[in-house]
Amino acid sequence: LLVCLFVCWNAVGAQDARSAFSSEETAQDQHVMEERIFINPCRKPGKNACMENCRSSPNCKTMSFVQSSIRP
């Protein structure tokens, strides 16, 4: 639960940082907002809901991959 939220939330932070330097800032911001909307349910207590949502969300999978690529 915490791992999924941590990875997804950090990925959104990284996306925020990149969007500031992106020529596609509007598109980036829209994607960030979609990611935040996806994350909201993960804040609620739940056994496997967060991990299941994380695995089933294409956005989260993509952002998790990007985050792992950023950090060595």
Swiss-Prot record:
The keyword Secreted is annotated on this UniProt entry: yes
Transmembrane segments: none
UniProt propeptide residues: 15-18
Keyword Disulfide bond: yes
GO cellular component: extracellular region
Signal sequence residues: 1-14
UniProt PTM comment: Contains 2 disulfide bonds.
Tissue: Expressed by the venom gland.
Swiss-Prot/TrEMBL keywords: Disulfide bond, Secreted, Signal, Toxin
Molecular functions (GO terms): toxin activity
Family: Belongs to the scoloptoxin-04 family.
Protein name, as recorded: U-scoloptoxin(04)-Er1f
